[in-house]
Design a protein with these regions (language model features):
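Extended, well-ordered protein cores
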Residues: 1-77, 86-185
C-alpha cells in the first residue's frame, strides 16, 4: 500500500544513521537496496590497475556518472584515490584545506591546486606524474590536452565508450595519442 518509508543505515557496530526521514511510496512500488564493501572495491581496483600495468595495456574506468549521480561518482572517487594513492596520502591535509573531492576526479585536484604557491603546486603535480609513471598508461579523453579518464567522472560514459572500444577491437586512446589495448573496468 502507499505510504512513507524511512531510509536508515546501520553500521557494523549497530549505530543507526537516518539517511532520509521520509520517502513517499506509491502503491505497488518496489524498493530494494544493496551494499558494497569499500575494502573489496578498493582491492579490486588495485588488482585491475596492477594487471593493466603487468600486461602493458591501458587502464580505463567506465561508469555512468551522469545517470547514477549518487553511486558512480563515489566509485569513481575510489578509483582515483587508489590510482593516485601516494598523492592523496601525502597531500591529504592540503587537499582537505582546498576542499578537493576525489569524486570529482583529477580535474578537481588541478583546479583546486591552481592557486597554490608555485613550488607547492609543482610538488603536487610532480607527485601526480610519478603515480602516472608508476602505474599503467591511462585511457585518454583528450591526449592532446592530457585529460585522462580519471579527470572527470562524467567524461567517460559507459554507454558511449564501451561500444567504441569494442568496435575498435578493444583499443582505446593512450597518453601518447596512439591506440592501445585497453582494460575496461
Amino acid at each position: 500500500s502507499a505510504g512513507d518509508a524511512r531510509i536508515e543505515f546501520v553500521d557494523g557496530g549497530g549505530a543507526l544513521t537516518v539517511l532520509k526521514e521520509k520517502e513517499a511510496l506509491i502503491e505497488g512500488e518496489v524498493v530494494d537496496a544493496t551494499r558494497m564493501s569499500v575494502k573489496a572495491l578498493r582491492a579490486f581496483f588495485e588488482e585491475q590497475i596492477a594487471d593493466a600495468k603487468a600486461q602493458n595495456i591501458l587502464f580505463s574506468l567506465h561508469l555512468k556518472a551522469t545517470m547514477m549521480k549518487v553511486s558512480d561518482p563515489v566509485l569513481f572517487g575510489h578509483a582515483v584515490t587508489v590510482f593516485f594513492r601516494d598523492v592523496f596520502e601525502k597531500h591529504a591535509d592540503t587537499f582537505a584545506q582546498l576542499g578537493v573531492d576525489a569524486n570529482n576526479g583529477l580535474g578537481d585536484v588541478a583546479t583546486k591546486i591552481a592557486g597554490l604557491p608555485a613550488d607547492q603546486k609543482a610538488t603536487i603535480e610532480a607527485d601526480i606524474q610519478a603515480c602516472m609513471d608508476a602505474g599503467p598508461d591511462l585511457y585518454m579523453v583528450n591526449s592532446d590536452k592530457g585529460i585522462t579518464n580519471l579527470h572527470v567522472p562524467s567524461d567517460v560514459i559507459i554507454d558511449a565508450s564501451m561500444p567504441s572500444i569494442i568496435r575498435g577491437g578493444g583499443k582505446g586512446w593512450g597518453q601518447d595519442g596512439e591506440e592501445g589495448d585497453t582494460k575496461c573496468v
